[in-house]
């Protein structure tokens, strides 16, 4: 963890939790695991205040704990989860994503949980003044939203072991399995191997239990729900749709899934990070191909979302067929008009031949497959159009998807490892282009293509003079985008007899950029804090109950102007921090 990430986390905790929590978090971030007596020495705070700060941070899973036996007594250590602290920046984005994916009421639930950290389902009902039995329309809507949030894993059910670091959980399981095998007469190597396998299997089972579809949900007789509606059948092979209502996630005709009132839930930041990255990928599809194809790709990614968190499928490659996409593609999205007909083509004869060949190929594939249900003419035409959009995605140089077979009018694969690497590469190139210009990105692409290249050879390939590119190369080397390797041709290592090879190391370049992003975001929040401190009296006056909402009546014109200027300044700084966070999302987290 870099010093800039530590500095940013300290600022965020101070901004949202106060000085006491910031002092405790800072000590844990800078010194690692500490006990309460150690924290008292590091922070000079009394024990009760430290305990209150730890409780507040543990409520948001920013601090975890583990109890161990030392000198025949129990000792509790605390450690920070710095990524959870950083996720404070994304709370607003999480609320917006849920409002787009589900509805505004579900977003209100996520907003409430983002302020509380975690809460019982019963507390959520009480906070919004809704009845848990769903006896009125608003309460039924709250029940439905909570069920969908839990079912689609936007909310995770909190277990006591979630407050223990994963490494300590594995250590506890390892000690337990070693105690069981004390009496076994086998070699230590074999015993350790078997224990490692047992620990890995048990951790996998615990994770599978966390991601179970029914985790945090209970069955309720259908008759107990006021004004029950008829259950609608879900399409075969479809993933849970965001527009699906509560009746679409029934287990059977006699019962319905409702949230467990005693379950503690919190926001699943991993799932929401995936949604943000999918939106970023869709943005690049729109830039490279077009709006309609980006809508098709967005739906492809949304269909694959449930599989990303599946325990049974650990492969980074996921597949789907054109027919599966057709059955689940919304009817209100028009993708047919985006495919250019022959009369609009520049070379109508060649385009007509190519389109007819593609349609004939799809017709042959449709005849070869034995589908259980007949496809009408509209669905068949829709499948052909979607297949054309998928072909565009596969033919793109960025390889958003790839074709792997002909099953179901075409089988397509999405490699999320490739997508992560590709997204980082194009985002980094975009950053270099904005910082140093088109010449820099041109040189970077040549160096990436050649691996290691000497400056003279680079000048010949780029059709530039050496003195013109040397400044650009040096500037990129200063930020870590390029590195220089010396290869002497003689033992005296004379500069005239030495090759100087330029090369690019992506991992190191991304890591240095990530540190710089943390540094810049921290400076933005420091500027925001200073701006508020300079106008502290004005802010305190504007936040009075009798003035809030009536600023024009109680504040003088120069105060209103100063307040408006401050809010505009805050908006600009927070917007810039949000844009930088989008880059952090790409370079730090995997899909």
Swiss-Prot record:
Residues 220-244 are annotated as: Disordered. Transmembrane segments: none annotated. GO terms for molecular function: single-stranded DNA binding. Residues 517-538 are annotated as: Leucine-zipper. It is found in: Nucleus. GO terms for biological process: transcription by RNA polymerase III. It comes from the Eukaryota. One of its GO terms (cellular component) is nucleus. Keywords: DNA-directed RNA polymerase, Nucleus, Transcription, Zinc. InterPro entries: POLR3C_WHD, RNA_pol_III_RPC82-rel_HTH, RNA_pol_III_Rpc82_C, RPC3, WH-like_DNA-bd_sf. Pfam families: HTH_9, POLR3C_WHD, RNA_pol_Rpc82. The keyword DNA damage does not apply. DNA-dependent RNA polymerase catalyzes the transcription of DNA into RNA using the four ribonucleoside triphosphates as substrates. Specific core component of RNA polymerase III which synthesizes small RNAs, such as 5S rRNA and tRNAs. Belongs to the RNA polymerase beta chain family. Component of the RNA polymerase III (Pol III) complex consisting of 17 subunits. Interacts with maf1. This is DNA-directed RNA polymerase III subunit rpc3. It comes from Schizosaccharomyces pombe (strain 972 / ATCC 24843) (Fission yeast).
